[in-house]
UniProtKB/Swiss-Prot annotation:
It is a multi-pass membrane protein. Residues 7-20, 74-91, 140-143, 205-212 are extracellular. Keywords: Cell membrane, Chromophore, Hydrogen ion transport, Ion transport, Membrane, Photoreceptor protein, Receptor, Retinal protein, Sensory transduction, Transmembrane, Transmembrane helix, Transport. Residues 43-51, 114-116, 173-176, 246-260 are cytoplasmic. This is Archaerhodopsin-1.
Length: 260
């Protein structure tokens, strides 16, 4: 047995519920809570109005995710879907998490780029369609329907990522080098991590079943923590989110530019 599967099996045995993914859901809950409280402490006493908006949004992201992970840890937000002769465990609570948290992440980026409300509404609307169609695919009973909805969801994701990499990136560039550097770093993170989600879906238990539920849950947990807590850490340490009254550490991109 490989080390990851062995660790999951031991965790399931210790927790007494027989679910190999429970250990990773527990760790995910803990990491999301740590991220939430870290952002709260970091933002305590911040007076800049614009910075407070970013903190409020960014704190909500791991906060919502921690509630979703805790519910999955206790077996809530879990259902069984029969696909042919096989019964699949589907964590629909994960999609509920994404339905709330991914628009908030996009809102952070939209505020950073200072785009108009129509652009924000379009971005969030396509994102919501991406999540809902992904959930429909996960709950479908035939392989054809599942893969069709997966493709629909993936196309929506490509539209969102294209919008970030073109229109929003251009708008962020107009706001100066600090904003552009932070936006580009965060967008690169989103592009890499979000692209991994449909790949994991297609090779996981909801798709081809190449990897088991325990490993799938571990990988989703790593992606979620990085996409939420990692995103927030980069954003909230940047000068780009502040007015002239306060200034945390510069972004990594700005530091590199200064060194040159």
């Amino acid at each position: 047995m490989d080390p990851i599967a062995l660790t999951a099996a031991v965790g399931a045995d210790l927790l007494g519920d027989g679910r190999p993914e429970t250990l990773w859901l527990g760790i995910g809950t803990l990491l999301m809570l740590i991220g939430t409280f870290y952002f709260i402490v970091k933002g305590w006493g911040v007076t800049d109005k614009e910075a407070r908006e970013y903190y409020s949004i960014t704190i909500l992201v791991p906060g919502i995710a921690s509630a979703a992970y805790l519910s999955m840890f206790f077996g809530i937000g879990l259902t069984e879907v029969q696909v042919g002769s096989e019964m699949l465990d589907i964590y629909y609570a994960r999609y509920a998490d994404w339905l709330f948290t991914t628009p908030l992440l996009l809102l952070d980026l939209a505020l950073l780029a200072k785009v108009d409300r129509v652009s924000i509404g379009t971005l969030v609307g396509v994102d919501a369609l991406m999540i809902v169609t992904g959930l429909v695919g996960a709950l479908s009973h035939t392989p054809l329907a599942r893969y069709t909805w997966w493709l629909f969801s993936t196309i929506c994701m490509i539209v969102v990522l294209y919008f970030l990499a073109t229109s929003l990136r251009a708008a962020a560039k107009e706001r100066g080098p600090e904003v552009a550097s932070t936006f580009n770093t965060l967008t690169a993170l989103v592009l890499v991590l979000w692209t991994a989600y449909p790949i994991l879906w297609i090779i996981g238990t909801e798709g081809a079943g190449v990897v088991g539920l325990g490993i799938e849950t571990l990988l989703f947990m790593v992606l979620d923590v990085t996409a939420k807590v990692g995103f927030g850490f980069i954003l909230l340490r940047s000068r780009a989110i502040l007015g002239d009254t306060e200034a945390p550490e510069p972004s990594a991109g700005a530091e590199a530019s200064a060194a040159d």
